[in-house]
Regions:
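Phosphate-binding site recognition
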Residues: 1-418
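Active-site metal-binding core of divalent-cation-utilizing nuclease and nuclease-like domains
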Residues: 132-137, 429-455
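Structural motif
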Residues: 142, 457-459, 493
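Mg2+/Mn2+-dependent nuclease catalytic core
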Residues: 163-167, 465-482
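Metal-dependent nuclease catalytic cores in nucleic-acid-processing enzymes
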Residues: 172-179, 332-340, 427-431, 475-495
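Acidic-basic catalytic patches of nuclease active cores, encompassing PD-(D/E)XK
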Residues: 405-438
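Conserved catalytic cores of phosphodiester-cleaving nucleases, focusing on short active-site segments
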Residues: 426, 450-465, 479
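Domain-level recognition of nuclease-like catalytic cores that cleave nucleotide substrates
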Residues: 484, 488-512
């Protein structure tokens, strides 16, 4: 079986007999029921391949669809002129970079359909070439845009250039409304929705199917699709890792499944990671390794975000679908980028419960954040395995000595809320070690800062900033934080830690 890793061209995939999860029923449904669509999905989730599938369909290439769902659904197989804009590969961090890319597309189309000197702007040229294409071919045109938001995402740190990109895109896309009579179908994709309102404000008939129940599995794959299409590969993966087929499916599910794009829907597997795992026969963080979420980290720092909240974030429909909210809330972009997903829904308060979709994303994201809190590297005193041994063995003194060295080695400059920084750092340490960790756990008499559980020990940790370790330990006792574990057979260890905002490290610690 040939796995289409990196293959984003539908014709290439079909003619070279790569494995394909049939999504053509969605192609027919979209073309049959509507005209203008927008789809938001994380990167490497199959958006480009789906656009290419649409392109082949509107080119009337019936032979490519033999054996697929749409083959007998469609009767006409007409050919339409297609304007396919791919913004995924270009660099938009320089002035005029977006203009250059759009100009290149227009120049190529004008060679085929003609140009006019009076069309002085990108928008006017686009408007003119659409009309001439429709007149020349005798039919309406199809417009496909891949990664509409790439110019906006790449200029988060340059508001002036981002505003320039937005203005150009808004004028360019406004043509889709003014030239409606010449357009048969339009489909636009992106990672995020922010900017959609300002960029597409003139295109008020754009249907957003990102959270539409009918299109949840339009990209990616369900467990049923995984098992039905890749049974041979699953068996090979099981044999290579000494597991049964059932255990292998469970491992794939835990590591790569878990994306939910609407409440009460089945999970969707990350196709890129699944295909790489079946090819290389090893479970690794393939999706995460292809792109580091630098802009998301910048957002978290900008908003002084509490990392523990990422596993219990609650958000309304308006929030996770909001746009242009970077200045007030990082959650919409983090969700839309695929680092958070819908884990549940509170019917009473109409709130989505968000969290990491799977192990790949959680472990990858937390490990990516670690260098922000320590000079982590091969020579760093922060060695996860040593921390794990200390905590599992019930050696808090050793653990605290390593923790002190961990902060002492840190070159990161604490900005803003120092207490938040230390809390985030401790949370990262314990989560990366793989321990059950809760932060600010409510009790009958207050909130304990950090609770860590292993098979043999329960650690109750109270932290103070510019206070004293004794004060922290006293709070554990006075608030009776250990009471809920009185009947637990595990040993309870109480730790009081005092951090210094001046030295940016552990000033003192005390065991109880």
């Amino acid at each position: 079986m040939k796995y289409p890793i990196g293959i984003q061209n539908f014709e290439d995939l079909r003619r070279n007999c790569y494995a394909y999860v049939d999504k053509t029923n969605f192609v027919y449904k979209l073309a049959d029921e509507g005209k203008y669509y927008f789809l938001s999905r994380p990167r490497r989730f199959g958006k480009s391949l789906f656009l290419s599938t649409l392109e082949a369909y509107f080119q009337g290439k019936k032979e490519l669809f033999e054996g697929l769902a749409i083959y007998d659904m469609e009767k006409e197989w007409k050919k339409y002129p297609i304007f396919h804009i791919d913004l995924n590969t270009a660099n938009f961090r320089e002035k005029d970079s977006l203009y250059i890319v759009l100009n290149d597309y227009l120049t190529a189309w004008e060679k085929k359909y003609g140009a006019r000197e009076s069309e002085a702007t990108l928008a006017l040229r686009f408007k003119g070439v659409i009309a001439r294409a429709a007149e020349k071919e005798g039919c309406s045109v199809v417009i496909l845009v891949d990664e509409y938001d790439k110019p906006i995402l790449q200029t988060l740190s340059d508001p002036e250039l981002q505003a320039e990109h937005r203005a150009q895109l808004k004028a360019f896309y406004s043509v889709l409304k003014t030239q409606d009579r010449y357009i048969k179908f339009a489909f636009l994709t992106g990672v995020t929705k922010f900017g959609k309102v300002s960029v597409f404000s003139d295109l008020n008939n754009l249907t957003d199917i990102s959270m539409d129940y009918r299109y949840i599995s339009i990209c990616g794959m369900t467990e049923k699709e995984l098992v039905e299409n890749f049974k041979e590969g699953i068996c090979q993966l099981a044999e290579a890792n000494g597991d049964t087929e059932e255990v292998t499916i469970a491992k794939l599910k835990a590591r790569y499944d878990g994306y939910h794009f609407e409440a009460h829907t089945e999970g969707i597997f990350n196709p890129f990671s699944v295909l790489n795992t079946l090819t290389k026969l090893r479970f690794k963080d393939y999706w995460f390794e292809t792109g580091t979420p630098t802009f998301l980290v910048d957002l978290l720092k900008m908003h002084s975000y509490r990392l523990p909240d990422m596993t219990k974030e609650r958000a309304s429909d308006d929030v996770i679908n909001s746009v242009d909210s970077l200045s007030t809330n990082p959650i919409p972009v983090i969700y839309q980028s695929g680092y958070l997903t819908i884990k549940g829904y509170d019917e009473r308060f109409k709130k989505y419960l968000l969290g990491f979709p799977n192990k790949e994303v959680e472990e990858g994201f937390l490990n990516f954040l670690l260098p922000l809190y320590t000079s982590a590297g091969s020579e760093s005193p922060f060695m996860v395995d040593e921390f794990v041994r200390d905590v599992e063995a019930g050696k808090p003194e050793q653990f605290l000595k390593r923790l002190t060295a961990f902060f002492a080695s840190n070159s990161y400059q604490v900005a803003g809320d120092a207490e938040l920084y230390f809390q985030n750092a401790l949370y990262l340490v314990f989560k990366i070690m793989g321990f059950y960790t809760q932060v600010e756990l409510p009790t009958s008499e207050g909130r304990m800062d950090i609770l860590v559980k292993t098979s043999d020990y329960i650690y109750i940790i109270e932290c103070k900033l510019d206070g004293s370790a004794e004060e922290a330990l006293q709070q554990i006792d006075s608030k009776n934080y250990a009471a809920p574990f009185a009947m637990d057979k595990r040993t309870v260890i109480k730790l009081g830690i005092n951090f210094s905002s001046k030295t940016r490290g552990v000033e003192s610690w005390k065991l109880g």
